[in-house]
Amino acid sequence: MGEIIDGKKLAKEIQEKVTREVAELVKEGKKPGLAVVLVGDNQASRTYVRNKQKRTEEAGMKSVLIELPENVTEEKLLSVVEELNEDKTIHGILVQLPLPEHISEEKVIDTISYDKDVDGFHPVNVGNLFIGKDSFVPCTPAGIIELIKSTGTQIEGKRAVVIGRSNIVGKPVAQLLLNENATVTIAHSRTKDLPQVAKEADILVVATGLAKFVKKDYIKPGAVVIDVGMDRDENNKLCGDVDFDDVVEEAGFITPVPGGVGPMTITMLLANTLKAAKRIWKMN
């Protein structure tokens, strides 16, 4: 029976550490600031942004929310981002995705100053990640690495398989595992003999967006299984990309959904914002 990795507990520990560090900085008259830009009225995005704000304030940081209507022009959004780039009280900028179709996400991400790109999506940060240089790492992949390490697993020398090749999770988490000296395979919808490929993994990260896609026959006994999915099953119950009940018997460690990867994402955003503030103050 696999041990369940408690993402809530780990996220709380990291957040407490960030909060303590912020409190020390505030004593010196320095307060990290995070600005979130929300375009339109997507309810899921709104809920997510509210959570980010609440957690930012709990950590003792300045939290700014800028709301823009669905029909805002691309030009207006870019000018808002440019103003935030110049704002000395803001150290992290996050534009909540997805954006309306008439706005280029690429252009918006490219406009965010890479020193304030706490989502880790700017091409400079992506490039730095790939050459192994210190950078802002996308929050979910950063959280995944912390979850793996929390099990006591030595990543170096392990076989890691990542199912999913998105720019937000699959590719960056594969690169982080490579930077930790794992031997990494990226698998996807066109991979032949996927269960065989997955079964070689000491560390399996699943980010397919398909409910309960990974079954027990994908799992090497004792593997660390990280489930990035947020899906609904046939009974409309929240589940992941891994069939938890089927896989938990084979796995050594496994993240649940909910309560696994999810809580780590906002926590790593706070860690990135603190890091951004410290870097900006050091440069100045």
From Swiss-Prot:
EC numbers on record: 1.5.1.5, 3.5.4.9
Cellular component aspect of the GO annotation: cytosol
Lineage: Bacteria, Bacillati, Bacillota, Bacilli, Bacillales
Name of this protein: Bifunctional protein FolD
Subunit structure: Homodimer.
One of the record's GO molecular function terms: methenyltetrahydrofolate cyclohydrolase activity
Matching InterPro entries: Aminoacid_DH-like_N_sf (IPR046346), NAD(P)-bd_dom_sf (IPR036291), THF_DH/CycHdrlase (IPR000672), THF_DH/CycHdrlase_cat_dom (IPR020630), THF_DH/CycHdrlase_CS (IPR020867), THF_DH/CycHdrlase_NAD-bd_dom (IPR020631)
Single GO biological process annotation from the record: tetrahydrofolate interconversion
Residues in coiled coil: none
Claim: Oxidoreductase is one of the keywords in the record: yes
Species of origin: Listeria monocytogenes serotype 4b (strain CLIP80459)
Function field: Catalyzes the oxidation of 5,10-methylenetetrahydrofolate to 5,10-methenyltetrahydrofolate and then the hydrolysis of 5,10-methenyltetrahydrofolate to 10-formyltetrahydrofolate.
Keyword annotations of the record: Amino-acid biosynthesis, Histidine biosynthesis, Hydrolase, Methionine biosynthesis, Multifunctional enzyme, NADP, One-carbon metabolism, Oxidoreductase, Purine biosynthesis
Chain positions recorded as NADP(+) binding sites: 164-166, 189
Pathway it works in: One-carbon metabolism; tetrahydrofolate interconversion
Reactions catalysed according to its record: (6R)-5,10-methylene-5,6,7,8-tetrahydrofolate + NADP(+) = (6R)-5,10-methenyltetrahydrofolate + NADPH; (6R)-5,10-methenyltetrahydrofolate + H2O = (6R)-10-formyltetrahydrofolate + H(+)
Family of this protein: Belongs to the tetrahydrofolate dehydrogenase/cyclohydrolase family.
